[in-house]
Amino acid sequence: MAELDQLPDESSSAKALVSLKEGSLSNTWNEKYSSLQKTPVWKGRNTSSAVEMPFRNSKRSRLFSDEDDRQINTRSPKRNQRVAMVPQKFTATMSTPDKKASQKIGFRLRNLLKLPKAHKWCIYEWFYSNIDKPLFEGDNDFCVCLKESFPNLKTRKLTRVEWGKIRRLMGKPRRCSSAFFEEERSALKQKRQKIRLLQQRKVADVSQFKDLPDEIPLPLVIGTKVTARLRGVHDGLFTGQIDAVDTLNATYRVTFDRTGLGTHTIPDYEVLSNEPHETMPIAAFGQKQRPSRFFMTPPRLHYTPPLQSPIIDNDPLLGQSPWRSKISGSDTETLGGFPVEFLIQVTRLSKILMIKKEHIKKLREMNTEAEKLKSYSMPISIEFQRRYATIVLELEQLNKDLNKVLHKVQQYCYELAPDQGLQPADQPTDMRRRCEEEAQEIVRHANSSTGQPCVENENLTDLISRLTAILLQIKCLAEGGDLNSFEFKSLTDSLNDIKSTIDASNISCFQNNVEIHVAHIQSGLSQMGNLHAFAANNTNRD
């Protein structure tokens, strides 16, 4: 009770608060309660007593007490309790508006792309064919002009004044005029034609192609999955597969995946490969060039046709042809600069390939049907097996006929070879001869590296030399670029020569360790140059 009597009454406390707010304390207040504030009592962490704060000077906010009489407390004052900020998790209700907005934007974008003009705008803006991609995605006209006008300018970090000076020196370009558009179209056509010539290896000097990019795209091959543009009724972009390549007209024959579109001939500047396109440095086209036989006139060999040709009589296609009288006549020895017999074999070859393509298509459809039946655990009928076996037997017979015709066509090519600077059929090619000589030198040097021959048996050293020559031939064929059918077939001839010299007990080992691997390499090389048919072993040589 004594302590309660010493406390000020409520009215005096209110006056003190008002005076504190006004910025001054009365002297009576300070004198009356100075004794109570000499030793301030700070509230501890676990105490619940009232806090007795020292009075402050309203002017300078300093402790107004006698430092000599007041005992300084060394304990640190109580810190304000920090309010822990708990991160709020975004609930589904908070992200719902964003999701709805995204869906709304997606619907609007889809509706926009349905418009014909918007669809064409997307095609013009982002669809670039393989032949146009390096032309449009390379350096722009300003960069090209900068390289030509200022070849010694190595930096691109210039000030605004310096860039303005360069633009004034270049002159102001006139764009969006009829003359400008005509000039741009003409330049684009010329660059496309130059790329086609490089793709077909019809140039020997690449100094005239400095305006082209450094990387030239390779031509697309048969079987490539592509996206092509159709015009007319079905105007738009559609996926499909290349079935044929026409280098003369620079077009591709594309069979589209969508039902009802069928097969169309599409120019190469409207066909884009779905797979990453392969490129080749432009400098590589000027290396190891071989003389092109495309523009050479075939020799007019003396040819005397027989009075009656069994091929014409037995072939229904040639038998009904209006050219039969001219072909079988004794007055005509050549037709278009080619012997008639050669043209007949080429016609038969084209016919057999067309029939074989149809059989392969039927076989593919039957394989799909068989896989479907197997997936449903359904039995395969006897009729289905009979039809499948019939197609397989017909394909086997077609392959035999194809080998016969190919052999006859190849024989004519052998006769044509000396006039084109190649070796005839009964002589090894120059590449094979060079590889054999280099292989013998390598084996001889490796065998006598220590001063004494490591292998004294001549048959073994000869076998090692021939096997090394095969490796060198494969290397030359892979680096040659433009594959030659005669040099390609020389690889098979080298294998046959080695196989004929080894012992019969080692033939199985040779087939498993050498021949099968070379066959895989031949398959890959033949796909590069489309020489698989001419490189096949022709067993029917009648």
From Swiss-Prot:
An example Gene Ontology molecular-function term: DNA binding
Coiled-coil spans in chain: 354-413
Gene Ontology BP, a term: DNA biosynthetic process
Cross-link (Glycyl lysine isopeptide (Lys-Gly) (interchain with G-Cter in SUMO2)): K21
Family to which this protein belongs: Belongs to the lin-9 family.
Tissue expression remark: Expressed in thymus and testis.
Keywords tagged on the record: Acetylation, Cell cycle, Coiled coil, DNA synthesis, Isopeptide bond, Nucleus, Phosphoprotein, Tumor suppressor, Ubl conjugation
InterPro entries, sorted: DIRP (IPR033471), LIN-9/ALY1 (IPR010561), LIN9_C (IPR045831)
Phosphothreonine modified-residue sites: T96, T304
Compartment(s): Nucleus, Nucleoplasm
Matches recorded under SMART domains: DIRP (SM01135)
Region (Sufficient for interaction with RB1): 2-296
Positions of post-translational Phosphoserine modification: S65, S95, S309, S321
N-acetylalanine modification, residue list: A2
Known function: Acts as a tumor suppressor. Inhibits DNA synthesis. Its ability to inhibit oncogenic transformation is mediated through its association with RB1. Plays a role in the expression of genes required for the G1/S transition.
Subunit structure: Component of the DREAM complex (also named LINC complex) at least composed of E2F4, E2F5, LIN9, LIN37, LIN52, LIN54, MYBL1, MYBL2, RBL1, RBL2, RBBP4, TFDP1 and TFDP2. The complex exists in quiescent cells where it represses cell cycle-dependent genes. It dissociates in S phase when LIN9, LIN37, LIN52 and LIN54 form a subcomplex that binds to MYBL2. Interacts with RB1.
Source domain of life: Eukaryota
Pfam families in the cross-refs: DIRP, LIN9_C
Keyword Phosphoprotein: yes
Species in which this protein is naturally found: Homo sapiens
Name the record gives this protein: Protein lin-9 homolog
